[in-house]
Swiss-Prot record:
ATP-dependent specificity component of the Clp protease. It directs the protease to specific substrates. Can perform chaperone functions in the absence of ClpP. This is ATP-dependent Clp protease ATP-binding subunit ClpX. InterPro entries: AAA+_ATPase (IPR003593), ATP-dep_Clp_protease_ClpX (IPR050052), ATPase_AAA_core (IPR003959), Clp_ATPase_C (IPR019489), Clp_protease_ATP-bd_su_ClpX (IPR004487), ClpX_bact (IPR046425), P-loop_NTPase (IPR027417), Znf_CppX_C4 (IPR010603). Zn(2+) binds at residues 10, 13, 32, 35. It comes from Synechococcus sp. (strain CC9311). GO terms for cellular component: HslUV protease complex. Residues 50-79 are annotated as: Disordered. Keywords: ATP-binding, Chaperone, Metal-binding, Nucleotide-binding, Zinc. NCBIfam families: clpX (TIGR00382), PRK05342.1 (NF003745). Residues 1-51 form the ClpX-type ZB domain. The keyword Nucleotide-binding applies. GO terms for molecular function: ATP binding; ATP hydrolysis activity; ATP-dependent protein folding chaperone; protein dimerization activity; unfolded protein binding; zinc ion binding. One of its GO terms (biological process) is cell division.
């Protein structure tokens, strides 16, 4: 038996019993004292991140599970470093076309939120000298698909240099049912912050498709609505502010799992959705139900007119309208700031193609410049692309699909053709998806136009 024991080795590092001081046996596995010390260091590091201090009697370690060192947390915002509302809106104007009213609402709301964090000072400083408590105001964005709801939230996080996470409300279910727990939203934010709890607690979470968790009727149902009203109930404490237990590996929580604690009282939640049919609810309350038909000129202008009218009606939105739509009053009360985004017209789509810093025209010009090809778009070609995107009724998302279809053959052939150094996208090429006008530079050979 002693001879057999001499061949025992650690199941993790592979060292034999003679190479270590202690070898502990388990059901079919063995672990040495060195691996136990390494595990303790990893656990100490996770507890430091979750609670801000190491375990009692243990010295903090700077090692991570990957063997590297963690970056230090960024300093908390101060009243002097927070950008003013006009500065925030100016930055949004560089990235997002149109939506002036929504950008103004969000600029003020975000400024007040981070001003509140600076005032609190993590429970110290100025806030300790006054009895006034500042409560956070989450934001509800209402607008059709492709109008810029996600981009607005993402641009705000980029400017403020805070972690940003996007969640899909349609994948969430009430605890105990198949689907994602609401705590998994916080895990995504934590991962964006490199598992830095302090940094994650100053981040922004955007919950998309929030209108899809509306309950089926205004009256409470006697049956269980695990993906509708049940999710709204589960989100209440998280939106208001609570200390949530987040499983570090995701998935369902169980009693024997170590969880990371995150305080959500400083996290800004932005919820967005299309809310199709909400304008009808508002019109019914205002007594403006119209009976009749809108003439169609064959180019879909009746649909565009209806979208614009819907956005105008939603400016008179009241909390009771959202209750009739299917959101519970407790959920609406935790989203005190709301902004309505308007549908994008053809002129706005043209601006999106050319004006922002990351405009599609600039992106594809940069891609082809890496192949020493200068790409240009005629003004009429840009108009044709915007017109086609407007016809597809998916907002700005349609633009990339159209340009990708348009550029497929060109980006396949041009990198291999050394004779072409410039290319111009024309209106005819957009309308027919064939041909193009090649503009060779002096000393280059004329490239054949495709049929």
């Amino acid at each position: 038996m002693a001879k057999f024991d001499a061949h025992l080795k650690c199941s993790f590092c592979g060292k034999s019993q003679e190479q270590v001081r202690k070898l502990i046996a388990g059901p079919g596995v063995y672990i040495c004292d060195e691996c136990i010390d390494l595990c303790n260091e990893i656990l100490d590091e996770e507890l430091i991140d979750a609670q801000g201090n190491p375990r009692h009697g243990a010295e903090p370690s700077k090692k991570t599970a990957a063997g590297g060192t963690r970056k230090t947390s960024k300093p908390a915002p101060t009243l002097a470093t927070i950008p003013k509302p006009q500065e925030i809106k100016g930055f949004l104007d560089e990235q997002v076309v149109g939506q002036e009213a929504a950008k103004k609402v969000m600029s003020v709301a975000v400024y007040n939120h981070y001003k509140r964090l600076a005032w609190q000072g993590d429970g110290q400083g100025e806030a300790a000298q006054t009895a006034t408590r500042l409560h956070k105001s989450n934001i509800l964005l209402i607008g059709p698909t492709g109008c810029g709801k996600t981009l607005l939230a993402q641009t705000l996080a980029e400017m403020l240099d805070v972690p940003f996470a996007v969640a899909d409300a349609t994948t969430l279910t009430e605890a105990g049912y198949v689907g994602e727990d609401v705590e998994n939203i916080l895990l995504r934010l934590l991962q964006k912050a490199d598992m830095d709890v302090e940094q994650a607690q100053r981040g922004i979470i955007y919950i998309d498709e929030i209108d899809k968790i509306a309950r089926k009727s205004e009256n409470p149902s006697i049956t269980r609505d695990v993906s509708g009203e049940g999710v709204q109930q589960a989100l209440l404490k998280m939106l208001e502010g609570t200390v949530a237990n987040v499983p570090p590996q995701g998935g369902r929580k169980h009693p024997y799992q170590d969880c990371i604690q995150i305080d959500t009282s400083q996290i800004l939640f932005i919820c967005g959705g299309a809310f199709v049919g909400l304008d009808d609810v508002v019109q019914k309350r205002m007594g403006r139900n119209a009976i009749g038909f809108v003439p169609n000129d064959g180019r879909g202008r009746n649909r565009a007119t209806r979208d614009i009218q819907a956005a105008q009606v939603l400016r008179h939105l009241e909390p009771d309208d959202l209750v009739k739509y299917g959101l519970i009053p407790e959920f609406i009360g935790r989203m005190p700031v709301s902004a309505v985004l308007e549908p994008l017209d053809e002129h706005a789509l043209e601006s999106i193609l050319t004006e922002p810093r990351d405009a599609l025209v600039k992106q594809f010009s940069t891609l082809l410049s890496m192949d020493n090809v200068q790409l240009d778009f005629e003004a009429q070609a840009v108009e044709a692309i915007a017109k086609e995107a407007h016809r597809r009724k998916t907002g700005a998302r349609a633009l990339r699909g159209i340009v990708e279809e348009l550029m497929l053959d060109l980006m396949y052939e041009l990198p291999s053709d050394q004779n072409v150094t410039a290319f111009t996208i024309t209106k005819a090429m957009v309308e027919e998806h064939t041909g193009g006008k090649v503009l060779p530079l002096p000393g280059t050979k004329q490239h054949k136009e495709s049929a």
